[in-house]
Curated annotation (Swiss-Prot):
<keyword id="KW-0808">Transferase</keyword>
<feature type="region of interest" description="Interaction with substrate tRNA">
    <location>
        <begin position="61"/>
        <end position="64"/>
    </location>
</feature>
<dbReference type="GO" id="GO:0052381">
    <property type="term" value="F:tRNA dimethylallyltransferase activity"/>
</dbReference>
<feature type="site" description="Interaction with substrate tRNA">
    <location>
        <position position="127"/>
    </location>
</feature>
<dbReference type="InterPro" id="IPR039657">
    <property type="entry name" value="Dimethylallyltransferase"/>
</dbReference>
<keyword id="KW-0460">Magnesium</keyword>
<comment type="subunit">
    <text>Monomer.</text>
</comment>
<keyword id="KW-0067">ATP-binding</keyword>
<protein>
    <recommendedName>
        <fullName>tRNA dimethylallyltransferase</fullName>
        <ecNumber>2.5.1.75</ecNumber>
    </recommendedName>
</protein>
<keyword id="KW-0547">Nucleotide-binding</keyword>
<feature type="binding site">
    <location>
        <begin position="36"/>
        <end position="43"/>
    </location>
    <ligand>
        <name>ATP</name>
    </ligand>
</feature>
<dbReference type="InterPro" id="IPR018022">
    <property type="entry name" value="IPT"/>
</dbReference>
<comment type="similarity">
    <text>Belongs to the IPP transferase family.</text>
</comment>
<feature type="site" description="Interaction with substrate tRNA">
    <location>
        <position position="149"/>
    </location>
</feature>
<dbReference type="GO" id="GO:0005524">
    <property type="term" value="F:ATP binding"/>
</dbReference>
<dbReference type="InterPro" id="IPR027417">
    <property type="entry name" value="P-loop_NTPase"/>
</dbReference>
<keyword id="KW-0819">tRNA processing</keyword>
Length: 314
């Protein structure tokens, strides 16, 4: 591939990470949280930990939570769900909007339920804003406003998403610099915060500081070397396409789910572009791989600032 392969490693010169089997059971009240980039093996590690410690998995994935969005979300298979119960997978209707705050509320309820039955919750997911919301809470910025979101969507539809992103850049360049123009939901949210409060999203985040933990959490991730992770991404995309991903998206669009938040996620967005004639068939898989790798780079940026214990997993 033309771009440099990806790496998920604690340090290029570090010793090999320990086996996942060395992970100690959680202390009382401690929350095990499996993080890591797409295709690194989070689901398998979470299931093994649940099997080992008598636990259940709580998904922290902003696409897996929706029903109908199956192949391209990497949902656990029926066989995997038979090994460990999963929460917040196939939990809500595709057109229901779930943000980080609502996820944290749902996850807290699931964690309380699991612990109430004497079992161990294992959080697993690559939507790191959701993980942060659960572990650290969110900044006290103004709550979401559906009217503002609808207004911003109308601007994006009429003038293009780049135009909405430019509006954000004019008032909050720091947020605009970290958000892709196509990320309509997050661009709209950042712009909405400024419009409603007169302060940038970055200023709200700086004020919060995210220093007081709501949970004593231990972050775990699977170590993958560059070539291995790159291969896993390509194989995953190819496999999903062979299993009928295009047909799944075609069905979703035909049933009125074109405005579902998950339809704008990596992979689903590219398949939709293909079905709408904007992306040739022979360019579909490479486009999804490129978008996935871009997303993984953003995930890795977040991981670099966290205290993550890396383990080896076959």
């Amino acid at each position: 591939m033309s771009e440099a392969a990806l790496d998920l490693a604690p340090d290029a010169g570090a010793a090999a990470p320990p086996s996942w089997e060395t992970i100690a059971p959680p202390a009382p009240g401690e929350l095990l949280v499996v993080v890591g980039p797409t295709a690194s093996g989070k689901t398998e590690l979470a299931i093994r930990l649940a099997e080992r410690f008598g636990g259940e998995v709580v998904s922290a994935d902003s696409v897996q939570i929706y029903r109908e969005f199956d192949l391209g979300s990497g949902k656990p298979t029926p066989a995997e769900r038979a090994r460990a119960a999963h929460h917040l997978v196939d939990a809500v209707d595709p057109l229901q909007a779930i943000d980080a705050q609502r996820f944290a509320e749902l996850a807290e309820a699931a964690i309380d339920d699991i612990r109430g039955r004497g079992r161990v919750p294992v959080v697993c997911g690559g939507t790191f804003l959701w993980v942060k919301a659960l572990v650290l809470g969110l900044s006290p910025a103004p709550p979401a406003d559906p009217e503002a979101r609808a207004r911003h969507r109308a601007i994006a539809d009429a003038e293009g998403r780049a135009a909405l992103h430019a509006r954000l850049a004019a008032v909050d360049p720091e947020s605009a610099a970290r958000l892709a123009p196509n990320d309509l939901v997050r661009v709209s949210r950042a712009l909405e915060i400024y419009e409603r409060s007169g302060r940038t999203q970055s200023a709200w985040h700086a004020e919060h500081g995210f220093r007081e933990r709501r949970h004593a959490a231990r972050l775990l991730a699977v170590h993958r070397d560059r070539a291995e992770l790159d291969h896993r991404i390509e194989a995953r995309v190819a496999g999903w396409l062979e299993q009928g991903w295009v047909d799944e998206v075609r069905s979703l669009l035909s049933r009125g789910y074109g405005d579902a938040r998950a339809m704008g996620s990596v992979g689903y967005r590219q398949v939709r572009e293909h079905l709408e004639g904007r992306l040739p068939a022979d360019e579909l898989a490479p486009a999804i791989v490129r978008a996935t790798r871009t997303f993984v780079r953003r995930q890795r940026t977040w991981l670099r600032d966290q205290a993550v214990a890396y383990v080896a997993l076959p």
